[in-house]
């Protein structure tokens, strides 16, 4: 993992998970170009309600509103930065008012080396919000001075100089996710080929090589959710080997998805009508894949009942 600094009271080397207080309010700030947008996206992926570019004077009002609906918005992240121009000068006053009112919060400060920030602005072909008619580096210098006191009092200072987008998202996950390391949500979906391929499928497994229960009169009215049909499908020659090999083949792919900070994937299992074979195989694959670490499996049957 890329290096970062997590500071809680005193600065420490490496990433230390930050134990959340009772009130889940996180103020996200830091240098322009240090990755606030990526951090916001990562927080949203883990259930945080994110408000971007909020004037600091509105922090107390928003926190008060959310405090009356903790079940609706249990985790609130507010992004405040120099884009609010003159309004940002009141940030310390606003944070002091939060503390005085008894609202518990944390401050995440994202930072990066000047040369890295300059390169990111140049690559994005965007001016620094404070550079005016000067250079990007001039704007960075002004911003550092404006944010100096805020950085000194931040609960977490995260240096993103060595991070790419995925590395930063992973760091945010480790620091602020209730579940810790990245969890992949895998939806195993049965479907019928005659109704078309699922447009959101990352993988497609074809179960049409299995003998079709449709041609067995006593099984035809039932579905792959019924035990008799499931036993017939999963007991057919080659099916268990197919399932075993498919699960093994997916293991490095799912590991890679997590490393790339991908949170969602869909495995589609198809047969002709989506009633018998694909349903039974999807259920078996779901059971096997649910044993993977940090994989949450759901099962859906797109075309079941469509006939």
From Swiss-Prot:
Which superkingdom, per the lineage? Bacteria
Q: Which InterPro entries match?
A: P-loop_NTPase, RapZ-like, RapZ-like_N, RapZ_C
Region of interest (Disordered), residue spans: 1-21
Sequence positions that bind ATP: 30-37
Q: Mind telling me which HAMAP family this protein's record contains?
A: RapZ_like
Q: State the family named in the UniProt similarity comment for this chain.
A: Belongs to the RapZ-like family.
Q: What is this protein called?
A: Nucleotide-binding protein AAur_2084
User: Lineage in the entry?
Assistant: Bacteria, Bacillati, Actinomycetota, Actinomycetes, Micrococcales
